Amino acid sequence: MTAMRTRESLAAAELLDRAGVPGDGVLFLHSAFRRLGAVGFRAEAFIEGLIDYMRHGTLAMPTMTWRVVTPANPWFDELETASHVGIVAELFRRHYATHRSLHPTHSVAAYGRRAAELTATHHQGDTPCALTSPYGRAREMDTHVLLLGIGLERCTAIHHAEEMVAPEVYLFPPEAAETYQCRARDGSVHPMRLRRHLRLNRDFPQFAAPLTARGLMRHGELAGTPWQAVSQRDLLGEIFAALERNPRAIIAPPGAPVIP
């Protein structure tokens, strides 16, 4: 896809260049578009600009469904189950992504060179962000994370580190696994058992300061909307080290504000 030269496509290209995102790599975008929409940015045109910049690589967006796919409603449909993480991710899922991982709570939509590889095995794990998930598969790729209008509190990749280092702290035990059915776009149905994340007050934003101090995280603004960007390798390296020192390092201290 080649985007028309629009305000949004030019802004997307400038943003990704300033964020240090390689056009032939993998980009995970987490976004809140409200401020950009308020100043006239069109979400569809912005997505097309992102896709054009990443035309030799892969664009991925989390398409969470944990609020609606539950033990009381245990069906996930790759094409039909709507996400609840904002307009950009939902438009991308519906109109641009060629692949979506099969997962009842933490699916990922993707477009580009490695979209199939990134999303192929999510349903083979028994946790939301296992090695078989896009977050785990992305560790083998040149992956960057961009947080637009939000901060690390919305960065799903951090859950991957939790699951790898201290699953007993952050996940329900194996005996509490739930049963779900995932329908792929070809109509095939894949049953899976899932251990959900425990509801804990996590302090993901604490990792921004050390990453920034070491020159590993970039910051900026796009039309008044703040952004942060970091390579997934650097991000997970910081968090793996923290969890290996203290498996409860991510949990906010008593009395800390609750991050919704």
Where does each model-flagged region fall?
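Short amphipathic alpha-helix with an adjacent loop that forms part of the alpha/beta core around
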Residues: E14-G20
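N-terminal active-site beta-alpha-beta segment that forms phosphate/nucleotide-binding
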Residues: G20-A72
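Histidine-centered active-site/metal-ligand motif
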Residues: H30, H159-H160
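Internal, conserved structured core segments that host functional sites
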Residues: T70-H159
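Acidic/aromatic/glycine-rich contiguous surface patches that form carbohydrate-binding/processing clefts
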Residues: P191-P260
